[in-house]
């Protein structure tokens, strides 16, 4: 039979501590020095299409990842992410692209509605099929959102 001892065992009593912050920063500094390109030399560089600077890891891979262990097995107090307060951040280039597409589409809609022709240049042409395909006579477009909702509901009901 097994017996349960009173008090902490050797495994529980031993505590593992990680490196100090100074050790982590020193090691990180050493690794970052390895990633910096070497100073230019007087020799012409050889043509190597896949040459990598000397270092402990390839340039395409990310650098070392710092891992912070829990102190005494406790999690750090963190706030749960709230979806109500979060806003997506957009880059300036993204906003410019959205603005360009929006303005271009508004111009096309104005020209299709019979707005000013503008210098008599080419106008957008809306495609209208003159002889519809008889196979598409009873075609009903599908609402993908509704279809995915039905599939999701079917999976949920089949699992329970």
UniProtKB/Swiss-Prot annotation:
Highest taxon in the source lineage: Eukaryota
Primary localization class, coarse: cytoplasm
Start and end residues of each stretch annotated as Disordered: 1-64
Modification type N-acetylmethionine: residues: 1
Keywords annotated in UniProt: Acetylation, Cytoplasm, Methylation, Nucleus, Phosphoprotein
Modified residues (Omega-N-methylarginine): 35, 65
Residues modified to Phosphoserine: 61, 82
GO cellular component, one term: nucleus
UniProt cross-references to InterPro entries, sorted A to Z: MCRIP (IPR029428)
Compartments (UniProt record): Cytoplasm, Stress granule; Nucleus
Pro residues: compositionally biased ranges: 37-61
Record text on subunit structure and interactions: Interacts with DDX6. Interacts with MCRIP1.
Family statement drawn from the similarity comment of this UniProt entry: Belongs to the MCRIP family.
Name recorded for this polypeptide: MAPK regulated corepressor interacting protein 2
Taxonomic source organism: Homo sapiens
